[in-house]
Amino acid sequence: FAMKDGRMQPFLPGLPGSNSNRITEAHAWSGYALAKWTRGAWTLTAGARYEDVSLLKRDFTAADPRRSGKVRIETPNHAAAWLPGFGFNVKLTSQLSLLGGVHRGFAPPSATLYQKAENSTNFEGGARWSSRRLKIEAIGFFNNYRNMLGSDLLAAGGQGTLEQFNVGKAAVGGAEFLAQAQPRIGHVTFPLQLTYTYTHTEMRNEFSSDAWGDVHVGDEIPYIFRHAANAQLGAEYRGYELNVGLRYNGAMRTVPGQGAMPKSETIPSHFIVDASAKARLNRHVTLTINAINVTNARYLVSRHPSGLRAGHPFGLYGGAIFNW
């Protein structure tokens, strides 16, 4: 391209691209039915969803960069699934309730020959306490995958083809905890929130892929934190808000494995502090400021692609919100 009179104009035509010379299209439709039944302290919810996806990949190859159609490889794929679900909520008292459910999970495959859809059965159950200024939740979950899909991403150590591959049987389970409170002193409200998630993952079959290499039964799924916690501390007074956020992520694997984590295949745990403030000048104008990684902590977020990737350094962002 060349600049002429302040505008960019084509100068020397280049050759058409020859890498990933393909077009992929999908046609999908879905429908669902939902029913809710309430009687006394009980609320039951049941439903079902139907998904139908047809895919077609047309690969014109490097020999036909202009996509004339003389050389073309077509790869179709199709997936359809019924996805039932059931949930319940029962109030033990005006503040305490139990909840749970079981649902079928689904994700469509890519336009790859013999590629299977992702399907799973997801269970959850727990308790919730809720009052005017206090809310506490404790939820356990377990996802049983009959077939999990993985993606060939550079960010996950693959070749970056974006193609999906069959992982097979896997399990993901854990627990979540949430606590929220809004104590008030005079005219100042102090919103507080604490969350914690524990996640355990496990491969239940063996396979090999370009992205993950050799995977064995019992290996953990990469790039999933086993421990993650977040705390939010705030103060609100009329049109002014001040918030401090504390983030903790435990160590995680960057390739499938089990047992002790090798240093070369681990993202170490890290603790980050963020802050934000908001001032409402009038009914139309609000000013905001956000500080990310206030302590300028040095931490890692990935080992892919092509080596270590650092987390966000200290950053300061300001803005204005206008409403009319």
What are these regions (language model features)?
Residues 41-44, 95-98, 133-137, 186-190, ...:
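Repeated loop/turn-to-beta-strand initiation elements of outer-membrane beta-barrel proteins
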Residues 14-22, 63-75, 109-123, 160-166, ...:
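Extracellular loop and loop/strand-boundary signature of outer-membrane beta-barrel proteins
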Residues 146, 190-191, 248-257, 278-324:
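C-terminal beta-signal and adjacent terminal beta-strands/loops
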Residues 91, 97-101, 117-182, 190-206:
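Membrane-embedded beta-barrel scaffold of Gram-negative outer-membrane proteins
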Residues 31-37, 86-90, 125-129, 175-181, ...:
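Residues on the lipid-exposed face of transmembrane beta-strands in outer-membrane beta-barrel proteins
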Residues 1-93, 109, 113-114:
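Signature of Gram-negative outer-membrane beta-barrel scaffolds
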Residues 1-3, 39-41, 50-56, 102-108, ...:
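Transmembrane beta-strands of outer-membrane beta-barrel pores
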Residues 38-44, 165-257, 295:
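Gram-negative outer-membrane beta-barrel transporters
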